[in-house]
Structures are given as C-alpha cells and as structure tokens.
Amino acid sequence: MVSEKTMAERVLALMGRPNNIRNIGIIAHIHHGKTTLTDNLLAGAGMLSEELAGDAMFTWWHEQEREREMTIYGAAVSMVHEYEGDDYLINLIDTPGHVEFGGEVTRAVRAIDGAVVVVDFVDGIMPQTETVLKQALREYVKPVLFINKVDRAIKELQLPPNKIMERLAEIVVGVNDLIERYAPEEFKDKWKVSVQNGTVAFGSALHNWALSVPYMQKTGIGFKQIAEIYNTAADAKEIRRRVWEIAPLYRVVLDMVVRHLPSPKEAQKYRVPKLWHGDLNSKYGKAMLEADPNGPAVAVVTKVIVDKTSKQETAIARVWSGTIRRGMEVWLLNANKKVRLQQVGVFKGIQKIQIEEAKAGNIIAISGVRDLQSGETIVEPEPDGSKPNIPPFEAIKHIFDPVVTKAIEPKDPRDLPKLIEVLKLIQKEDPTLKVEIDQESGQILISGLGDLHLEIVEYRIKNDFKVDIITSNPIVVYRESVKGQAGPVEGKSPNKLNKFYITVEKMPDELYWKLREKLLKGELPEGKIKKMNEDIIKHLMSLGFTREEAQRCKVIYRENMFFDMTRGIIHIGEVIDMVMDAFMQVMDHGPIAWEPCIGLIVKLTDAQLHEDAIHRGPGQVIPAVREAIKLAMKDAGLVLYEPVQVILVDVPPDYIGDVTALINSRRGAILDIQTEEDRALIKAKVPVREMIGFTDTLRSATSGRGVWYLVDQVYEPVPRELFDQIVREIRQRKGLPLDADIV
Ligand SMILES: Nc1nc2c(ncn2[C@@H]2O[C@H](COP(=O)(O)OP(=O)(O)OP(=O)(O)O)[C@@H](O)[C@H]2O)c(=O)[nH]1
C-alpha cells in the first residue's frame, strides 16, 4: 500500500511511531540457523534481493566468521514489515550462538524487548538454547519460538506428519520448561509459548517457508501442501520458488513478531524499573517508563563496532526516552564527560543512513564519538548544561568470568604502541576480553573465556589489524579462599605504631550464591560502598545479615565482603579508606600465589592508631592491614580453587568409549550420558587446566564428528596432590618466593 515511498522514507516515518516498532533479537544454539533466518527475513522485507538470501550471509561481517562458520559479532539490521494494513519497523540484532561469546548475547539483549528463539527440529533444545534464553528472560525480554530445519524431517528423515507434530510438541514443552524456570515471576505464565495462540512457528530457513496456526487459519495453507511440494519438486530451487508462493518465511515470522512481541512503549513500562535503579518519579524515570519522545534524552550503548580500516568506531545504542539529535551535546554518565554526537544514523537493511534525530524506542548508530563504551548511559544535560544527577543504567553483566590468560607481545618491539591501541579497540567491542599489564613483569596479559576465544582475538589482531604477535601458552586463572574461620589476627604497621585486628571467614555457600546473583542483577553495588542507603541495607539483610552488620558493610569486591565492626575508635574515619584499599589489594592478589580471592568475609574488629596523622599514612596502614588479612587467611586454612567447565559433548554413539576415555584422561568426570539413535550427548565436568587444546583432541578422537559446548563454569578446590605443583608453577611464573608459606 505504501510501496511508492522509498524504503528509507518508510523507515524514517516509522521512527516516530513507537507503537509500530519492535526491537528484537534472534537467539539460538550454534548452527541452529539464525544467520539463514536473518537473511531470509531481510530479503522478504525487501531489503536484500531474494536470490542472495541464504547464500550471501550478509550479516557475516568478519572473514574469520566465515572461516569458522560462526557468527561472532552481532550486527544490527532494520526492516519494514506490513501487518494488517500498517507498517512496522523491525530492528533486529543478530546474536552469536557460541557460548564463548556469551558476552555479546548479554549486551545484545539489553537493546531488545523480544526474541525469536530458534530451535533446530532435529537437534532439539541444546545447551546454548538454555543459556541464551536464560539471559534474555533475565533482562525481561519476551520470547516467541521458531522451530527450524523442518525440511529435514520431510526429506531426510521421512517422518510421517504425526511424528513431526509429536516432535514439535516436545520442543514446545521443552522451551516452556525453560520459561517456567527462568522467566520473571510475573511472566512465567503469560510468556509460555503455544502453537494455538500463534507464539510458535515452524519451517525451514534454508528453503524459506514457515507455518503458524494463525497463518494456517487465515490462508488455509497447511503442512500437507508443503509436504506435497517436497514430494514433487525437482530440486531445492523449485522448492524455494513454490513454498515462497504459499507460505513465505518472512511473513509468518514477522507477523508473529509484530503480533506477539511488545513495542518499546509497552516493554519499557516493565523493563525500565528492572534495568535502571533511579527514581521512577523523576522526569527521567517518567519519560523512560512512557518512552516519551518529549522527555529528556536517555540512550544506552549496547555495542561498539570498530571499522578495521578506518578504525572509526560506531556505537549501537537504544534510545529510552527523549530525542537524540545530530550535533547535540550529551553527558556520558560512566565516562563522566560531555561530548557532541557528531553523526546519528539508523539502519535500512544492513546499510546505515544518516539522520537528524531519533526518538525514544529506536535503535541508532552513533559515530564520530571516541570513548563510547558498551554499557555507557548517554543523557541530555540539564537545561543549564550540567550533568543530570541520575544513576547510569545498570552495568551489563556477563555470566562467565574470563579464566584463561595469555601473555602477548608484538614480534617487532616497535609495534608495541600499535598493539596497545588495537587491544583497546578490540576490548571496546568485546568487554568479556580482559586486558591488563602485569605490574611486576610489564607483560601484556589478555584473558578470555577459553582458548578458542583468545584464538579468535589473536586472529583479529594479526589479520584485521595487521600486527604480528607472539603469544605465550594459555595460563589458567585460579581463585584463592579459605576453609574455615580465624582471627582476630593482629597486623602491625612498619613503624609499629598502629595495629589492626582482622577476622576472616569462608562465606557460606548459600550466601555466596545469593550474593553472586544480587551482583549479577545489579541489586548490590560492586566496590567501595560510598553512600549506604536503605535499598542496599535491605538487600544485605535479605542475605541474612542483621541491620547493624549491613550498615557496617564497607566494600563488596570480587565476591568478597568487608565489614568495619569497630566502635568508637578515634581517627578511624581518617584511615578507613586505606583499610578498604588494603582489603581490595589482597582480594586482587591472594596470599597463596597472588591469584584473586573469592567467597571471603573479612572484618576489622579493632584497631590502635597513633594520634599523629604523620605516623598513620598509607605507607603504614596498608601493609599492616594486608598482613593481618593474609595471616588470618592462613590460619583459616588456605584453599586454591580452579575453574572447572561443565561441557556437553555431542558425538555419534560409536565414540562414547573414546570420549569417556578422553575425559577421564583429563581429570574429568562424566555426569550424564544420553543416547539417541544416531548421537550421544555426554555431559562432563573438566578442569579448565585440562581443557586447553580439547577441541583438537576431540576432533581427532572422533574423526572430526564430535563437537562440544560449554554449559556452565564453576570453581572447585584443586586436588591435594596437585596443590604444591600448581602453586609452584604460578609463583615461578610470577617471580614470587617459592618456599614461603604465604606471599
Ligand atoms: N536443512 C536445513 N539446514 C539449515 C536450515 N537453516 C540453516 N541450515 C543450515 O544450518 C547451518 C547453520 O546455519 P546458520 O544460519 O549459519 O546458523 P547460525 O545459527 O547462524 O550459526 P552460528 O552463527 O554459527 O551460530 C548451515 O549449514 C545452514 O545452511 C534449514 O532450515 N534446513
């Protein structure tokens, strides 16, 4: 009906109609067909030529993605879809399926309100289906389901229709189990998917068709006609042409998106209170709840893309309220600076078009601004130009910590500045990657979620940014903790004029998991608690602390807590900040081998301070407190934890024996084995130390037919017989004394 208008005009017109916008993502286990689906949706919505879809893989930006056949870097695309006589703007953020890139998924879900969960008909629900759906639900993203690759049921497996229906029903039940488990309480029922109400569609992204109950009812087209085409068509090309005429994928899937996924106006009402902890009655709170284009502008950056040739940075951001205009000055709340937005764009298909302004509810591309980080909150200044006094959006949390580190250096030392610049850029795109300079050795250390993650980073440095590098073997990151409790232990300052008394205890497991969850959700702050408030006290009390203890909590750092339990000590206020610094230093570098600590409760119970401030400076206080914490930890019984990955290995059943042997040889344990006709799913637990190179070994042990996925990551104590060896290795590497009890 509006075809005379150009696509760009249609996109621009829709940007001002938040009820007609859908910000969505496609989430799925690796290789379940997201990219193929995205291409076909784009093609259907007239953004790509139909011929290319499925082959061109337009969302594959990076060469190595093609090489590895995985989508690593999510891209943003937009399309226009007509539904019941009206236009809708669909902004789609592609998300990677491989869990080593889980950080990408987490960031992408922040920008979207709804998700199409893609499940492979044959594979069924796989580990990443669960991980990504969990992440989406945690951020209040509503799901609908698309069951893909149904063509295989018809052609390859030749299943009769009743078997196909049974299998579809099984997948729906499985997805609903996950929704029951992970959806927020108030949406557990409302968000269940159902074939009857049209929140489930199924089809073939490869052949470009889909069906849903509403579509079947509206058109009278059913599974019979589709099966008929498969049975009579000469080749895949003919199948595509004929199914396109009766049940084009984009129409069925995008109808489902428009009909069942929320507009920004609807979604922001319940998402803003969860993702932003400011005052909902302030002008910012009100404007965001309503996605009000006339309120103050607030936007959140969910991704930064760096062009490898021009090195220009483009930030993808979601506008939550107000109107972002080209050339406007804004505050970056985390970076704490004011910048001018040089260029603002939106997507038309995969192309960026420059625009003058974007209203609340839209996804935009900002270029020409340095220092924009993923997670940054952008706010319009107060009328007098000052920084608005509102909290930033909650930091974007990642479920897995980096556990593998490599030292990296340029082949040619003159490339060092270039390497540092490149690492900064890559880290901007991928904040799950950690880059540090080792204080002692001066080495550059990069840490990631596994050796595959780091391999991809190395590939980008060499091929995209053309810096030749040398890297060390991967090093595993351990954690230090204690078995029991100890103290008060005395720590004396070097001048012997100040004394601090410290107790240390292991955090009970239940408390640890609850604390971790609260940190992930952003309900408790990380770092020094600058201003204690009722909200923090309430959350601490729900962890089991008394009101008084809660009020005395000073720092929550790396999943450890510090409390000041002293009473009436004169001058304590002048040194407490240094005491907190000392606590954080030990949590960064524990006494066993300078690895980070977890799960500790550290309390300052008493102190004797010299009355003259000259004698109680940082040089006196910090070493005294550090020593007291380390000695107390030693008395409480030191424990070294190693990261352990729970993995799922997918192999033909003939290889169960080989894989079991492989896992046993790597200090692993088999947790579960499920066999189906032509595959076995082996769930196992393997220390990360033994996972290095696992992919290649698995491949050769299974003639290339085995793959594995990361399901979970936990820490477990290193076995007694390995403790000395591992501690020695780490200390040697770090140049620490080998024979000392503690370092
Ligand atoms: N038979 C069949 N194969 C499909 C279908 N959809 C996708 N595929 C194939 O499945 C493989 C993975 O498809 P992709 O679209 O790359 O999957 P993806 O989920 O984007 O994969 P990653 O980006 O690697 O996570 C490719 O070989 C596709 O050709 C389908 O409907 N039927």
UniProtKB/Swiss-Prot annotation:
Keywords for the protein's UniProt record, in alphabetical order: Cytoplasm, Elongation factor, GTP-binding, Nucleotide-binding, Protein biosynthesis
GO cellular component labels: cytosol; ribonucleoprotein complex
One Pfam family named in its UniProt record: GTP_EFTU
Entries under Gene3D superfamilies matching the protein: 3.30.230.10, 3.30.70.240, Elongation Factor G (Translational Gtpase), domain 3 (3.30.70.870), P-loop containing nucleotide triphosphate hydrolases (3.40.50.300), Translation factors (2.40.30.10)
Domain of life: Archaea
Amino-acid positions noted as binding GTP in the UniProt annotation, renumbered to this chain: 28-35, 94-98, 148-151
Location relative to the cell: Cytoplasm
Modified residues (Diphthamide): 615
Residues of the tr-type G domain: 19-265
Membrane-spanning segments: none
GO molecular function, one term: GTP binding
SUPFAM superfamilies listed in its UniProt record: EF-G C-terminal domain-like, P-loop containing nucleoside triphosphate hydrolases, Ribosomal protein S5 domain 2-like, Translation proteins
Similarity field: Belongs to the TRAFAC class translation factor GTPase superfamily. Classic translation factor GTPase family. EF-G/EF-2 subfamily.
Listed NCBIfam families: aEF-2, small_GTP
Function: Catalyzes the GTP-dependent ribosomal translocation step during translation elongation. During this step, the ribosome changes from the pre-translocational (PRE) to the post-translocational (POST) state as the newly formed A-site-bound peptidyl-tRNA and P-site-bound deacylated tRNA move to the P and E sites, respectively. Catalyzes the coordinated movement of the two tRNA molecules, the mRNA and conformational changes in the ribosome.
Protein name per its UniProtKB record: Elongation factor 2
Species per Swiss-Prot/TrEMBL record: Nanoarchaeum equitans (strain Kin4-M)
